[in-house]
Curated annotation (Swiss-Prot):
This is Mitochondrial distribution and morphology protein 12. It comes from the Eukaryota. Disulfide bonds: none annotated. It is a peripheral membrane protein. GO terms for biological process: mitochondrial genome maintenance; mitochondrion-endoplasmic reticulum membrane tethering; phospholipid transport; protein insertion into mitochondrial outer membrane. Keywords: Endoplasmic reticulum, Lipid transport, Lipid-binding, Membrane, Mitochondrion, Mitochondrion outer membrane, Transport. GO terms for molecular function: lipid binding. Component of the ER-mitochondria encounter structure (ERMES) or MDM complex, composed of MMM1, MDM10, MDM12 and MDM34. A MMM1 homodimer associates with one molecule of MDM12 on each side in a pairwise head-to-tail manner, and the SMP-LTD domains of MMM1 and MDM12 generate a continuous hydrophobic tunnel for phospholipid trafficking.
Length: 269
């Protein structure tokens, strides 16, 4: 079953763009950057006009992990007294790591919930193919640390575009919260109609996720240096290193922050 996405409404939302930029910058602040790089941050983001292709492979009850975090919040007084009912345009995006792995059957780390569920709770396992025209602009300072530290500082502007993602993901709705997590990547010659999730056998799938999450199939990076001498090869080599660093960082962020058993969360939906 395929889903039609009102991508124009999502892509034109300033609130969503701001949340994504803030989230990316928060992640970049936590990344250990090379000594030749400083002040790296996202300056703008456009989601483009191409909507992702979404196909539902399984519908069922949300994983217990999503309820466990809800119970933890209730125990610490973090729950929303009004059930988080706020305007969708102001829904905060959070990152969460599953904290229930020691309470779950090791042979079935992602099992559907058998309790706690609210009346409208549900979960979709979806195939997402996103051949995008997204554009992310990043600014940074390129440092030349010879003959002294920060001897020269040059502004660098980078544009990330042509992102291609093909993945199996879980989207769960639990008590006015939406959880999104990537389960595994999908190769272009893989028969997703016969995937484990389509038959509901998520136990077999869960054992593969750690080694299979590499959802970025393509990412183009273009760079522009503020000023440099044409014959200064060391600077040009450093720019190439920045491009490689950014691509690796994006790949790692998706795996570490959104790959199961981690997820991002939208509240007040």
């Amino acid at each position: 079953m395929s889903l039609e996405v009102n991508w124009e409404q999502i892509a034109s939302s300033e609130a969503i763009r701001e949340q994504l930029v803030d989230w990316l910058n928060d992640q970049l602040k936590a990344v250990e950057v090379p000594k030749y790089l400083a002040d790296i941050h996202v300056t703008s983001l456009s989601l483009g006009s191409k909507a992702p292709e979404i196909t539902i492979r399984d519908i069922g009850k949300p994983f217990d992990d999503f309820y466990d975090i809800e119970e933890e919040r209730a125990g610490t007084g973090e729950g929303d007294e009004d059930d988080g009912r706020v305007a969708p345009t102001s829904t905060p995006m959070k990152h969460q790591t599953s904290g229930s792995s020691d309470q779950t059957d090791a042979s079935n780390p992602i099992s559907p919930s058998t309790s706690h569920d609210h009346e409208n709770d549900m979960q979709f396992v979806t195939e997402i193919k996103y051949d995008s025209d997204i554009c992310v602009e990043v600014a940074a300072q390129l440092l030349m640390n010879y003959p002294a530290e920060k001897f020269i500082s040059l502004p660098v502007r980078l544009k990330l575009s042509d992102l291609l993602i093909h993945t199996l993901a879980v989207v769960a709705y639990v008590n006015h919260r939406v959880f999104i997590s990537l389960l595994c990547d999908i190769s272009e010659n893989e028969d997703t109609d016969n995937t484990e999730s389509h038959s509901g056998n998520l136990r077999a799938l869960s054992s593969k996720t750690a080694s299979r999450i590499d959802v970025v199939k393509r990412l183009k990076v273009e760079s522009e240096l503020g000023s440099y001498e044409p014959d200064n090869g060391s600077i040009l080599r450093s720019v190439g290193k920045i491009e490689t660093f950014l691509v690796d960082t994006i790949r790692n962020l998706l795996v570490q922050e959104v790959g199961w058993p981690n997820w991002i969360e939208f509240q007040g939906v």
